[in-house]
């Protein structure tokens, strides 16, 4: 497969929801929101509802299944052009009933077979947001990625998101801060 697996993209998209709502990132409500307990490596695993929201981000025409074309659109939006050639292989591995599409059951099964979220997924997610490759994520970069994914947010909103995670007060999110946020049980 490619360096950007089907499951890494699921993870990246599932986390965008939290980046848009920084006030909920560390709330006690999230502790009892249906998230399962931490998985391997101590990382919180998404609930079925979160996975359904991720699935719907891929299912652009809302027909209950993901086509290869829809999957490629998401790859392009994430700047992962190199991975497009691997889409047929990904679908061959995930499309268990052989109908040429990935339905929600197959989507969940693929996630479960992968063992959930890995630290490499979190690092790859960081680099998706770090558009200029300087090792830090700015509010402008967050806004750019979210806009590419069809999420409309203001620069002010993105600044609040960054401040919610920025432990050292430099106005940017570094890898350590990003990993701490993503691996928190309260995410």
UniProtKB/Swiss-Prot annotation:
The record, for Gene3D superfamilies, names: EF-hand
Look up the coiled coil feature and give its residue ranges. Answer: none
Bias (Low complexity) occurs at 32-47
Q: Which SMART domains match?
A: EFh
The answer, when asked if DNA repair is one of the entry's keywords, is no
Question: What's an example GO cellular component term for this entry?
Answer: mitochondrion
For molecular function, the Gene Ontology terms on record are: calcium ion binding
Q: PROSITE patterns from the xrefs? A: EF_HAND_1 (PS00018), EF_HAND_2 (PS50222)
For this protein, the record's Pfam families field holds: EF-hand_7
- Region annotated Disordered sits at 21-47
Write out the residues that bind Ca(2+) 4. 166, 168, 170, 177
Q: Which SUPFAM superfamilies match?
A: EF-hand
Q: Where does Ca(2+) 3 bind?
A: 130, 132, 134, 136, 141
Give me the residues that bind Ca(2+) 1, please: 59, 61, 63, 65, 70
The residues that hold Ca(2+) 2 are 95, 97, 99, 106
Q: Which UniProt keywords apply?
A: Calcium, Metal-binding, Repeat
EF-hand domain sequence ranges:
46-81, 82-117, 129-152, 153-187
Describe the function of this protein: Potential calcium sensor.
Q: Which family does it belong to?
A: Belongs to the calmodulin family.
This protein is called: Calmodulin-like protein 30
Organism source for this protein?
Arabidopsis thaliana
């Amino acid at each position: 497969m490619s360096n950007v697996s089907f499951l890494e993209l699921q993870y990246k998209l599932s986390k965008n929801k939290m980046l848009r709502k920084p006030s909920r990132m560390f709330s006690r409500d999230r502790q009892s929101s249906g998230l399962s307990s931490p998985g391997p490596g101590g990382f919180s695993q998404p609930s079925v509802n979160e996975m359904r929201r991720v699935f719907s981000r891929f299912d652009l025409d809302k027909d209950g299944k993901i086509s290869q074309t829809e999957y490629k659109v998401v790859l392009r939006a994430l700047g992962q052009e190199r991975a497009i050639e691997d889409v047929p292989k990904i679908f061959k591995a995930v499309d268990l009933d052989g109908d040429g599409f990935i339905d929600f059951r197959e989507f969940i099964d693929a996630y479960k077979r992968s063992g959930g979220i890995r630290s490499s997924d979190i690092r790859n997610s960081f680099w998706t947001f770090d558009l200029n490759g300087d090792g830090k994520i700015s509010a402008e970069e967050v806004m750019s990625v979210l806009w590419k994914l069809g999420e409309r947010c203001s620069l002010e909103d993105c600044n609040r998101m960054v401040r919610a995670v920025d432990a050292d007060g430099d106005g940017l999110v570094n890898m350590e801060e990003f990993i701490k946020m993503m691996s928190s049980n309260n995410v």
